[in-house]
Amino acid sequence: MVQRFGHLPPCSRRGHQPHPYCSLGVFVSTPEASASSTKVVVKTQVQNDASDENAISVVTILLGPNGTKLTEPDQEVDFRPGQSVEAVLEIAMTQPALWSPSSPSLYRAITRIMKSGKVLDEVETPFGVRPLAWSVEQGLLLNGAPVKLTGGSVHHDNGPLGAAAFDRAEERKVELLKSAGFNAVRTAHNQPSPAFLDACDRVGLLVLDEPFDVWTVSKRKYDYARFFPDWWQQDLDAMLRRDRNHPSIVMWGICNEIPEVWTAAGAPIAKQLADRVRSLDSTRPLTQAFPGATYGPIQMRPSHRSISPGTTTTLHKTDRRIIAAFLAAS
């Protein structure tokens, strides 16, 4: 496949991810998780593309970190031609191996669509069990313990290799970050490659996943602002459905340095984005790069580059946690 990009600005966000990923219909979550027990919820969206009614079985095979089969529940589904149905399986698990940066234990859910004993489709979904919470008093809590995020913004390119997301280059980048003492990374400022997130899951690197560098106000002549009004929801949905099974992702971002956040015009856009994120995944907090008039819909209030005197004291009285980047002014 040959791709040619026109209108490349000096700081381009364009790149190439060589693998197509189309299996976005399985969502694995672990609500009520703890070291003693957890509930694994597997939601599978099934589409009947046949011309007649179908009765199928949705089967999920749960494999432990060592590959041992733990359970194999199933659910019968009947649906009409063209109908889309969500099958929900809830699986109880005792004494799960918790995922963390120091011990990134991964389970696998193999979801199969069966009819008359024949496998029609199969998707394998790696996932981790890790209770995630946040509070003003303690900040981000992973597996019940406060975690200080030590990391930085990492763009999608691979140095002299350019913006092609070669799997080994993505893995090496994550390994270098972890060996340098990072425990977290912010994806700046567009969707990372699946290979990058897979490596973060395996190595144990926490991720702030962030989709947009512009909304409606352009930063460059030919940037994404031309398409944002018509495409933001489709692109955001694609990122969330693709990435939400990664245990390494602990936070969603909705923008980077957007001019609109300083104006009242940005507030309804931020609310639209925040509401859409929560409709697809309510298990993680939201944030944005740059504080401003739009911070109402988010849980984590950022302080990007500087914190002016008095700001810390004022925000500490709210229900939002401050995330500081680069510099605190005094």
Predicted regions mapped to residue ranges:
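Substrate-binding/catalytic cleft of secreted carbohydrate-active enzymes
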Residues: V174-L177, A184-S330
